[in-house]
From Swiss-Prot:
<keyword id="KW-0067">ATP-binding</keyword>
<dbReference type="GO" id="GO:0005536">
    <property type="term" value="F:D-glucose binding"/>
</dbReference>
<feature type="binding site">
    <location>
        <begin position="11"/>
        <end position="16"/>
    </location>
    <ligand>
        <name>ATP</name>
    </ligand>
</feature>
<comment type="similarity">
    <text>Belongs to the bacterial glucokinase family.</text>
</comment>
<keyword id="KW-0963">Cytoplasm</keyword>
<dbReference type="GO" id="GO:0005829">
    <property type="term" value="C:cytosol"/>
</dbReference>
<dbReference type="InterPro" id="IPR003836">
    <property type="entry name" value="Glucokinase"/>
</dbReference>
<dbReference type="InterPro" id="IPR050201">
    <property type="entry name" value="Bacterial_glucokinase"/>
</dbReference>
<dbReference type="GO" id="GO:0004340">
    <property type="term" value="F:glucokinase activity"/>
</dbReference>
<protein>
    <recommendedName>
        <fullName>Glucokinase</fullName>
        <ecNumber>2.7.1.2</ecNumber>
    </recommendedName>
</protein>
<dbReference type="InterPro" id="IPR043129">
    <property type="entry name" value="ATPase_NBD"/>
</dbReference>
<keyword id="KW-0547">Nucleotide-binding</keyword>
<dbReference type="GO" id="GO:0006096">
    <property type="term" value="P:glycolytic process"/>
</dbReference>
<dbReference type="Pfam" id="PF02685">
    <property type="entry name" value="Glucokinase"/>
</dbReference>
<keyword id="KW-0808">Transferase</keyword>
<keyword id="KW-0418">Kinase</keyword>
<keyword id="KW-0324">Glycolysis</keyword>
Amino acid sequence: MSANSQPVLVADIGGTNARFALADTSLDAPLLKESIREYAVAEFPSLGDAARHHLEQIGAAASRGVFAVAGRVDGDEARITNHPWVISRSRTAAMLGFDELHLINDFAAQAMAISLLQPEDVVQVGGAAWVPGKPGQPRNYAVIGPGTGLGVGGLILRHGRCYPLETEGGHVSFPPGTPEEIRILEILSEQFGRVSNERLICGPGLVNIHRAVCEMAGIDPGQLQPVDVTARALHGDPQAMRTVDVFCAVFGAIAGDLVLTQGAWDGVFLTGGLTPKMLDSLQHSGFRQRFEHKGRFSSIMARVPSLAVMHPHAGLLGAAAYAADAERDAPGVAA
């Protein structure tokens, strides 16, 4: 363990649930598995209350923390859309009696997790196989994940250090690539005005695509949830099956664009709550064809790995990696 003998409290705060764990940053696999818990955010008035409850539940103490939140971190505060908590770093640290507390974006944590992932933590989705870089080897990675929304980030590895890219790339404009997708854009524009990638590639995005597909077919889409769309697709419903096909193809196109934008030639990691659930669809769809279909760069894109992250606690793992990196920056710690 580091100079501080206590483990670090790490958290992954989403719109509905909050996950906590203790991490020993001196270990290659830093998460202390027996300490991992998940709580509904609605059960607690604040992040500090949830964190304190967790420490009480596991009978542990901590004086440092890294909390990843599903929103933009702006100075001392983090804001999550439609979330009951107003998250203040300083107030939360004071409430917990912490000497040090970092708030980071959830996809900064997902990106940092790449530095600790093992080959068994990922599943190849077409293309080249992933070979983790050797210590000190420069690497550029992208990360993208559909869940309640669409998270986008990246990771730059230089001289043994990790530099996460915090972005709001899920909100860039949706670029249709086929006549069908142009029509889907037109239909969604009638509802939303501007249409971002997140309007299609996330859980609610499945419903949006399904509604557009049904409108093109002259069929009432009904009032469905994302799980209803995927369930209907499994049972052979034509519109639901087409929805999943469009989702995977657009996801692939966007992931490929992200690689080009970030120069992430060493691979893109697919995370988020939907990726494990839709893994079979991603592997047997147009995802990879659209990922590679980049004109003069198609042959280069064919060599870029696309990898589904299957680690059950990647956000917590990334928060632990961030904590380890922060320790190396601490005064008196040799690089």
